Amino acid sequence: MFDIKEQLKLLPDKPGVYLMKNKANEIIYVGKAISLKNRVRQYFQSSNNQHPKVRAMVTHINFFEYIVTDSELEALILECNLIKENRPKYNVLLRDDKTYPYIKVTMNETFPRVLKTRKVLKDKAKYFGPYTNISALNETLEVIHQMYPIRVCGKNIEKMIERQERPCLNYHIRKCIGPCTGMVNDETYQQMIHEIILFLGGKEDELIKKIEEKMKRAAEKMDFEGAAHYRDQRQALLDIIERQKVVSVNDIDQDIIAMAKGEQESCVQVFFVRGGKLVQREHYILTTREDEDEKEILSAFIKQFYGETNFIPKEVLVEREVEDQELMAQWLTNKRGNHVKVRAPLRGEKKSMIQLVKRNAALTMGQREETQRKSKEKTEGAMVVLQEALGLADAIHRVEAFDISNTQGMESVGSMVVFEGGKPKNKDYRRFKIKTIQGANDYGSIEEIIYRRYKRGVDETKAMIENTMTVQEGKFSLFPDLIMVDGGLGQVTSVKKGLAALGILIPVCGMVKDERHRTRGLVYEGKEIPIERPSHLLRFITQVQDEVHRFAITYHRSLRTKSILHSVLEDIPGIGEKRRKSLMKHFESIDKMKQATIEELIEVEGLNRKVAENMYHFFRKQ
């Protein structure tokens, strides 16, 4: 057993990272320290002077681990990586940071592409971002592809050249110079990529000089078409620069950072200044508490933001001093390769810019909170109205809805979708193959899936009571406040039969539609309850009906497709179960398989030339 008091005595007086864990062995906090011995002990001393968040966290600490590092800087880097990997509950976290897109230049390819991505990999590519404004990102990509005829396809260029494949339409309409033809000079292509990187790095002035030189050389050679192309490139860049605000007389790269706090999250606004011009601004949302220290929030943002991005400016301006400011500057200097300043200006032009950024952060935070308030009215408000409409004593938080799908009784499936607080909870959705009912019997099918779903829930609950299963392992143990079923009295009766067999009492209502297939009302306790039109409740019920139907029909279609694929492929010599799965995964449809060449078939995992030829000739005979 882990004895915290004894382990505290063994802590080394060295820099490192500590990981606080709860009873479920989950990492709930990651921190760094110049002295592990002193820092970790502070958590377990008198709580009188502790921050409320720290007091709350300490009550959940079951044990801790630590990693000794050679320096505090090394500890900072390790802390950043561990926070990103584990996303601990009590650390300040960038909300949905994985979803922010980047512009990626695929430097790991012979002929690089420029594309949008949501994953930052260690693959030698260059990444620019992250962008929270998708429109700005798409506009940037559009400008790049207008200016530079680089490839957009993900094909293997070497193989295309080797097979002498035809270039695509983009080559013929001059949107791509066609490296797949084998006639493109590598140096010419790399020069375009170099200029794109200058552009993405905010070096438009340097790029314009290069383009002007090329335009001049083309004119001297009487290459008027080339000169016109460079003129258009130059003008496109000038148009972009014209939209950029000059914020500094100094030709400097800066990121200016300020924040605004809300009740449960904070908004950090960043102005990106390149060469003295404001080229872009972005805002980022962090999950925080109302009593969270602003220094800690800004510090957490800087670690997470610059841990992801490739470009580090010469100067980072923040609205107030942050934790470990000198250490942050040292870390960023190492990442950039030359000196980086992190400072909180107190007066002058830089202070004015900070105040401007802070006003923008406050405006964004206010707009976000207003949007969330209206959203809450639609979602949680609909739950209150639903409770009142049904006359239920208890509040409705979790709703589970069911539907059946089949084609003339074949491939019958059931689906369950879940809503919590009026919002879909996709990870709790479940699908069921009908096992005991033959033919098109919706009532019997619903009774079966209800029994199976809640029988699993009962079994899991028993296992948890007996300590043979943890709460985290349970997939069916959470029961709803209300069950909804697509249909009327017959479907509701079937649900109740399934529940009665298990001795479970949960309110059940049916969702009925009119002759025009529009949501009409609810069936509850033998009566139909009309729903006001339009209303938040009607929108919610319609959303539930559409979602449960979509989920059921999608599953049904996928099973039918697999069944058809399976039966056709059975007739081809050399195609067994493993190869069938590979083909289904690769092509997804019979039509695509029929159109494939022998060479394309060989690319499927597990297929050799002989089997590929068998398939090719089999489909040609049909």
UniProtKB/Swiss-Prot annotation:
Residues 205-240 form the UVR domain. Interacts with UvrB in an incision complex. SUPFAM superfamilies: C-terminal UvrC-binding domain of UvrB, GIY-YIG endonuclease, RuvA domain 2-like. It is found in: Cytoplasm. Its main location: cytoplasm. The UvrABC repair system catalyzes the recognition and processing of DNA lesions. UvrC both incises the 5' and 3' sides of the lesion. The N-terminal half is responsible for the 3' incision and the C-terminal half is responsible for the 5' incision. Keywords: Cytoplasm, DNA damage, DNA excision, DNA repair, Excision nuclease, SOS response. The keyword Glycosyltransferase does not apply. NCBIfam families: PRK00558.1-5, uvrC. It comes from the Bacteria. Residues 13-92 form the GIY-YIG domain. It holds the Pfam family GIY-YIG. GO terms for biological process: nucleotide-excision repair; SOS response. This is UvrABC system protein C. It comes from Alkaliphilus metalliredigens (strain QYMF). One of its GO terms (cellular component) is cytoplasm. Belongs to the UvrC family. SMART domains: GIYc (SM00465), HhH1 (SM00278). GO terms for molecular function: DNA binding; excinuclease ABC activity.
